[in-house]
């Protein structure tokens, strides 16, 4: 073995973990020209979907659109490997419309591996990283001596040392992971794969604290043993919809149906009688699980008045018999799991291929991170994905992209890219993570955003693709396609605004008859489209629109016009927030004297001494409530100063 001071290999950036966060981070840094190594415990399980074989859903699809708009990869792969697509919340407003894709999990992983293997500047390595290597230096600030810690590299389980200028940890559920079935447990990051040992202790030694969370996954059953004729069918209804804005992305996968069954009174009785055998209710573990993806036993306990719960049966791929039993995760013993499954209609003779299990793991509370996802404690150490306390492939991928972007910018001595709540769901999620003391896995939700009508999936490219191009992740071909779309949107909006119909026109009479809505004198097509009972599909029927216009342009224009008033109000709110962000903060402010601030906010504000309100809003531990309190305090202070000035002027004049 080489001396630890003599590295086996050197890289600009090392990514630890090959899940969805790690893949986005590694591809990002390599595409931006930095030599990158992606380390993972198992190279055959890169970008694996250990739980639900699906991408998207409410708020999650918006995240995927945003990642793609910036130049990330998850949206393209989800589109290419989708075996079913549906639009969720289609009957509601566009702010909550959500695309969801059932993917072929093996095909998804295979294609991601191919992309990684063919990305310039990127090396793949199978090894367990057990130690972070740092170098310490002394700095002076305000005549005070400070010790700083900066990343130098990593060591593997077998003692090999790799040098790196920057590290991104994307370890998922693998840090000291332990899976549970009933009262039996074993060390594992997920079923069939060993946990990551040693790295947690290395983090502790460097001053980064970790805590424990829990998640779980349901059983997989053999589709040949299911009576599908007893189940409700759920076909693919949106195969023409895409996460990616790249016009070259296509899907050639066969489309399949999912099916729906329900729990029965017998299911509930069996669960209640065996609650004491589960890891949580039996007292074997006390880690918090995800609120929005509860186990079936949690549902039975917390919603005791419900006689039945919907369960979805989802194929894991085209060439596998495995069916994912969505909504039925459990920690019950294996033999009871099979009995439980057989209480469900259509599954009374089912064969279980893999049992459900719970997994608990170490995570890094994200209040220890900056908005860039760099750790506060150690320079050039970034953290992204489930290790930051989130749940979901989409949340992980978004963080991986952000960490990758900012790791490269730090090495280039550029300011980090900070995503604001007003600009993206990515920004909403990161702001929530670094300012809230979360004690359960975090899932992105549309309700978490104050600007959800502005932050839709369909306009993610309008919001973020210029930034992706500026960073260097959107290539010239994508950029030209984006500019062409923007031109089409502008031209179509202008055409609708300037095309008038007279009430005497034949087509106007037909519109009046069909819609039951009178046209007085004359009106523009734009004004017509604002009416709730008229849509672009009607314009196409009346031959009032170019039928060759892409669906993305048609949808974008219609939403912009129908919700114009709401969008203007939301834009005004955002502009006001942006103006507030420029409000200066004196370095003389003693935040300990502002009683309305939380203790953590006072401590961090005093430590960092932000120069303006915008910088204060990016400090970990400073919540939205703290920012409001600070604004009120500043306003009161301004009023007091105005009164003092006015009083002094009166004295002088007298």
Swiss-Prot record:
Residues bound to NAD(+): 289-303
Co-factor requirement: FAD
GO biological process, one term: tRNA wobble uridine modification
One Pfam match: GIDA
Domain of life from the UniProt record: Bacteria
A Gene Ontology term for the protein's cellular component: cytoplasm
Entry-linked PROSITE patterns: GIDA_1 (PS01280), GIDA_2 (PS01281)
Magnesium keyword on record: no
Binding site for FAD: 17-22
Main location: cytoplasm
Keywords recorded for this protein, A-Z: Cytoplasm, FAD, Flavoprotein, NAD, tRNA processing
InterPro entries: FAD/NAD-bd_sf (IPR036188), GIDA_C_N (IPR049312), MnmG (IPR004416), MnmG-rel (IPR002218), MnmG-rel_CS (IPR020595), MnmG_C (IPR026904), MnmG_C_subdom (IPR047001), MnmG_C_subdom_sf (IPR044920)
Keyword tRNA processing among UniProt keywords: yes
Gene Ontology molecular function: any one: flavin adenine dinucleotide binding
Subcellular location: Cytoplasm
PANTHER family in the record: GLUCOSE INHIBITED DIVISION PROTEIN A, PROTEIN MTO1 HOMOLOG, MITOCHONDRIAL
Subunit note: Homodimer. Heterotetramer of two MnmE and two MnmG subunits.
HAMAP family in alphabetical order: MnmG_GidA
Its job: NAD-binding protein involved in the addition of a carboxymethylaminomethyl (cmnm) group at the wobble position (U34) of certain tRNAs, forming tRNA-cmnm(5)s(2)U34.
Annotated family: Belongs to the MnmG family.
Annotated protein name in UniProt: tRNA uridine 5-carboxymethylaminomethyl modification enzyme MnmG
Organism: Prochlorococcus marinus subsp. pastoris (strain CCMP1986 / NIES-2087 / MED4)
